[in-house]
């Protein structure tokens, strides 16, 4: 299939709050979840990116600032300082 069908985020229904909470924990295991973080459309795009780029996995973010922040925060701790060039994406410096 070239394009998987689009799955609307509002169609993900949980029987209990506990079931919804468990789905949120298991997002890395392709468990259906509400929003951009766990629909079949989302998982198909991740799989395509892994195949195209030859990667081991793929994380999707709603914007560039979120992606940059996650990359930086995975290496620094509270109180750390980082050096960056003046030409970096402006919101990152803030």
What are these model-predicted stretches?
Residues 1-23:
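N-terminal amphipathic/basic leader segments beginning at the initiator methionine
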Residues 10-11, 63-64, 85-87:
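Fold-independent oxyanion-binding glycine-rich loops
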Residues 5-6, 57-59, 80-81:
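Structural motif
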Residues 74-92:
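Conserved PLP-anchoring active-site segment centered on the Schiff-base-forming lysine
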């Amino acid at each position: 299939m070239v394009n998987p069908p689009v799955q609307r985020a509002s169609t993900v229904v949980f029987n209990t709050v506990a079931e919804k909470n468990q789905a949120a924990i298991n997002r890395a295991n392709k468990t259906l979840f509400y929003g951009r973080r766990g629909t079949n459309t989302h998982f198909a795009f991740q799989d395509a990116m892994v195949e195209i780029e030859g990667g081991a996995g793929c994380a999707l973010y709603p914007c560039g600032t979120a992606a940059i922040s996650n990359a930086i925060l995975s290496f620094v701790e509270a109180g750390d300082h980082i050096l960056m060039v003046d030409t970096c994406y402006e919101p990152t410096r803030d």
